Structures are given as C-alpha cells and as structure tokens.
C-alpha cells in the first residue's frame, strides 16, 4: 500500500524523511512539502490522516523535571495558521478542497474540538473518543464525496 505524506514546512518533511530512512521504510513513503490546500490526490482512492495543530502540546518526558505528560501552554496555532487564516476558516477551506480533490477518499481527523465536523461542514461517519496524552480528543471519520451528500 503506497503511503503519501506531507507538511507545509520543509523542516517537518525533512524530519519525517530522515525518520523513515532510519526505520527502513523510506521507499514506501512519498513525502512532499506542500500546502494541504494545494495538494491534489496522488491516487484515485485512499485515506487521509490529519493531526492538525490545536494549540496545545504535551511536554516530553523530562522536559520539566517530573512533569511528563503535562500540557504545555497553548500556542498561536489555535488562533491562526501560517497564512493568517483562523482555524475555522482553514478547516472550512480544507473541507471544500477535499470534496473537490479527493472524492471517494476517507479522511480521519484527530481533534479536541467536538464541533469540528460543523466547522468543516462535513458529516462524520464515525466519532471515536481518544486521548492524546492528557488532551481529550475525537478521531473523526469523513467519507468524502464531490459536492454534497444531502438529498435534493
């Protein structure tokens, strides 16, 4: 199964490429530095996985003495993205892009925002409760179709 991965920041794709090489799986992964709002579907069908920034980080073990797993202060990622868009605007644009560029695909999004499906204007087909360290999240599944799933 081919794996396509990407990030808007070269630093992150370079980091992922080096980790994939160390793990011996680099040949199975196609990495691109690209904006998620610009990337076209690399195959007819597939699965998208997204763990977007949501303004909270989990401190790595030992970073503050015995504070392993505590939340770090929120970052600006909660309020805005690199192009200045708010999180709400970004997710609305992302959902529109996915419907146009990825019909027939499945998307999974990990988020602590329980209202994310409404912000994206997508109906989730699954909502799986999860914890990302101390952060309560949901893993949302969206079955992507071109246009709208609403009955006329």
Regions found by a protein language model. Give the residues of each.
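Class I S-adenosyl-L-methionine-dependent methyltransferase catalytic core
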Residues: 1-152
């Amino acid at each position: 199964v081919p794996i396509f991965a990407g990030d808007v920041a070269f630093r992150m794709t370079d980091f992922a490429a080096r980790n994939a090489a160390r793990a011996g799986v680099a040949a199975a992964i196609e990495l691109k530095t690209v904006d998620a709002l610009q990337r076209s579907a690399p195959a007819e069908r597939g699965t998208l996985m997204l763990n977007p920034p949501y303004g909270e980080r989990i401190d790595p073990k030992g970073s503050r003495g015995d504070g392993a797993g505590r939340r770090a202060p929120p970052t600006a990622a909660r309020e805005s993205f690199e192009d200045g868009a708010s999180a709400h605007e970004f997710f609305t644009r992302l959902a529109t892009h996915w419907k146009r560029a990825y019909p027939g695909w499945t998307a999974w999004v990990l988020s602590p925002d329980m209202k994310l499906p409404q912000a994206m204007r997508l109906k989730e087909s699954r909502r799986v409760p999860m914890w990302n360290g101390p952060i309560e999240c949901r893993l949302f599944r969206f079955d992507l179709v071109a246009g709208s799933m609403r009955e006329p």
